[in-house]
């Protein structure tokens, strides 16, 4: 008995279950945007797809299909078929899709059936699933309440959201964007494409819709852009018009938080701990040198981020913070000391982040329903349940 294909009514269950997907589109299409849970195992590579497309325009559908079969035959066909079979062997629930649920996924499905494997495909393909995900964002933004955690840079907003994630519905936008949302906030892994960001956001919202429907989803206050990706209009408008809680921590605590995130838990802090350990931590010379090189690259990255905001800082303050950063680099290289990083961090917060963030909140005329320390906010949230 054949497995039924996946219609529009089945997409909710598919995404909630993190179903493995085989995207048989060309790599160039996959890179622009794909469905969460998908691996790209194309039936046509980029060059073959382009040739088929040209033939379709010039000679019509029949000639294009004939060319496709000719190019993907013999050992080429067997290699691609084996890739699909290997993936399905590891993920028996895998589902196929192409752009519109047309020839590419249908032919893939038939070739698999010829081997005795029956894999469903998404009816309407990527295009229909993408429309479903966009509508999910719009529906969520209209019907589900948000509770927005705001506060100056270093207040520990992201950490707070992680700490309450087992007891409250939360959404971590920065994790989805793979960016901490500041000039210095790029992570070690590349950001997703805009389409991939939206698709993963939609799946997270879809999962949040399944439980605690009366309880607001807790989310960190974000600008429209987080790094190079941006929030869809409907969701950003909802975010800006939702109830707000303000995390209020003293400057010293905020500097400590930033120091932990950007120095202590990075290769800078790791390299420093290995070098100062008595007895020495078990590590190879190669490992120590890799960490040291990564630490140098991170200092270079911070210097570049500082340069990018130099005009907003102003010449004198930019020069001052730059010198503090270079002094911290020198202390790390020559003394294995990292505490001096707090000097440039503290000045960057006072000179740049506080005026920027607090000015934005004032312009928005934010009126929080609660304001207090991180612990006080956690207690307040628990009392609201």
Swiss-Prot record:
Q: GO:BP terms for this protein? A: tRNA wobble uridine modification
PROSITE patterns per the UniProt record, alphabetical: RHODANESE_3
The reaction(s) this protein catalyses: 5-methylaminomethyl-2-thiouridine(34) in tRNA + selenophosphate + (2E)-geranyl diphosphate + H2O + H(+) = 5-methylaminomethyl-2-selenouridine(34) in tRNA + (2E)-thiogeraniol + phosphate + diphosphate; 5-methylaminomethyl-2-thiouridine(34) in tRNA + (2E)-geranyl diphosphate = 5-methylaminomethyl-S-(2E)-geranyl-thiouridine(34) in tRNA + diphosphate; 5-methylaminomethyl-S-(2E)-geranyl-thiouridine(34) in tRNA + selenophosphate + H(+) = 5-methylaminomethyl-2-(Se-phospho)selenouridine(34) in tRNA + (2E)-thiogeraniol; 5-methylaminomethyl-2-(Se-phospho)selenouridine(34) in tRNA + H2O = 5-methylaminomethyl-2-selenouridine(34) in tRNA + phosphate
Q: Which residues constitute the catalytic centre?
A: 98 (s-selanylcysteine intermediate)
Q: Name one Pfam family in it.
A: Rhodanese
User: SUPFAM superfamilies, alphabetically?
Assistant: P-loop containing nucleoside triphosphate hydrolases, Rhodanese/Cell cycle control phosphatase
- Domain Rhodanese per the UniProt entry, residue ranges: 15-138
- Kindly give the InterPro entries that the UniProt entry links to this protein: P-loop_NTPase, Rhodanese-like_dom, Rhodanese-like_dom_sf, SelU
Entry keywords, A to Z: Selenium, Transferase
Per its record, what are the GO molecular function terms?
Answer: transferase activity, transferring alkyl or aryl (other than methyl) groups; tRNA 2-selenouridine synthase activity
Q: What is its EC number?
A: 2.9.1.3
Role of this protein: Involved in the post-transcriptional modification of the uridine at the wobble position (U34) of tRNA(Lys), tRNA(Glu) and tRNA(Gln). Catalyzes the conversion of 2-thiouridine (S2U-RNA) to 2-selenouridine (Se2U-RNA). Acts in a two-step process involving geranylation of 2-thiouridine (S2U) to S-geranyl-2-thiouridine (geS2U) and subsequent selenation of the latter derivative to 2-selenouridine (Se2U) in the tRNA chain.
**PANTHER family named in the record:** TRNA 2-SELENOURIDINE SYNTHASE (PTHR30401:SF0)
- Family to which the UniProt record says this protein belongs: Belongs to the SelU family.
Under the subunit heading, UniProt states: Monomer.
Looking up HAMAP family in the UniProt record yields: tRNA_sel_U_synth
Question: What's the protein here called?
Answer: tRNA 2-selenouridine synthase
> Coding gene?
selU
